[in-house]
Amino acid sequence: MGSERIMTTQQQFLDLLSDIEPSTTTVNDCSSAHNTLRDALKVHNEFSKVHVHTFLSGSYKRNTAVRPTTIGGITQRPDVDIIALTNHTINDDPQIVLDAVHTALKDIGYTDLTVNRRSVNVKLKKVDMDVVPIISDGYGGYLIPDIHLEEWLVTNPPAHTEWTVEVNKNANGRFKPLVKLFKWWRRENLSDLKRPKGFILECLVAKHMNYYESNYEKLFVYLLETIRDSYGIYASLGIIPHLEDPGVAGNNVFSAVTADEFKTFFEKVEEQAAIARNALNETDDDKALALWRQVLGNRFPRSASHKSANSADMASSLIRSALGAGLTFPSTPVYPNKPGGFA
């Protein structure tokens, strides 16, 4: 019974992972949007003078994004990060560089624009894009403008992408799926919390996941419990832990997280770790399903045994209806195309 439930639950997690992947439509929308913008920047009559090249960053590039959520019947837009390497120098004022990006985008025809601290946000009907200008530091690294601090800061977007690939390889391909589960968990449980999110969650998973476990149920429980056991003292004292930025030595990925945000995040992890542990120990499929849905939401699927029973009933009903209507069936099975992930 125990081994059967482990296999069943592993399939439930794999089914959930398939379900929370960005759809082919979403991927195509993102691809079309970022390519159009990047091509336009490259040939813009003014920006082309400072343009060196552009590349993608963020969860879209790292293949750690989950499907856009729907709030109040409205599907939220996916985020795409576009890095624009320019030939500006450290002597150029950060505001001037961001203004140059903003002016070019406005001139190209984008209307819903917001100049943020380190980027220009572009809102389209189906996609949000952040255009982030960076410059070379002259030594193989990069600098990013910060208009609040009015200075250039060390950054390294390509290193984050390379790091993600390496960590996923070390985890036998299970790092990125676990990140997606953790991001989905956060959305289900802490959707109103501003931070931690995104890349911070990826760093937490990399630091605290079990690299030798292959079962996703156990991986997820272990992740929550290890985060709970590692950061209780920080939450109780109201201080922010240091989690090293894998791209920039000495940087703390938690630096923008407030003490209150971290405490809220920690308390939810603590609460949910207990529920997840109970779900792992539960031998009754229905009770385990109810517990996992408390943790990962109502999209968490039923076990294969439940689905196969329901499918058999449905298939029988459909066949009876089809025969009654005089329909014919194809001689070979037709398989649906599974949605691909972000690339």
Curated annotation (Swiss-Prot):
Coiled-coil annotated residue ranges, if any: none
EC number of the protein: 2.7.7.-
UniProt keyword terms in alphabetical order: Antiviral defense, ATP-binding, Magnesium, Metal-binding, Nucleotide metabolism, Nucleotide-binding, Nucleotidyltransferase, Transferase
GO BP field: defense response to virus; nucleotide metabolic process
Database matches in SUPFAM superfamilies: Nucleotidyltransferase
GO molecular function, one term: ATP binding
Cofactor note (record): Binds 1 Mg(2+) ion per subunit.
Matches recorded under InterPro entries: NT_2-5OAS_ClassI-CCAase, NT_sf
Main EC class the enzyme belongs to: transferase
Cofactor(s) needed for function: Mg(2+)
Reaction equations catalysed: 3 ATP = 2',3',3'-c-tri-AMP + 3 diphosphate
Induction pattern: Part of the CBASS operon consisting of cdnD-cap2-cap3-cap4.
Stated family: Belongs to the CD-NTase family. D01 subfamily.
Role description: Cyclic nucleotide synthase (second messenger synthase) of a CBASS antivirus system. CBASS (cyclic oligonucleotide-based antiphage signaling system) provides immunity against bacteriophage. The CD-NTase protein synthesizes cyclic nucleotides in response to infection; these serve as specific second messenger signals. The signals activate a diverse range of effectors, leading to bacterial cell death and thus abortive phage infection. A type II-C(AAAA) CBASS system.
Protein name as it appears in the record: Cyclic AMP-AMP-AMP synthase
Native source organism of the sequence: Acinetobacter sp. (strain ATCC 27244 / 9458)
Gene name per UniProt: cdnD01
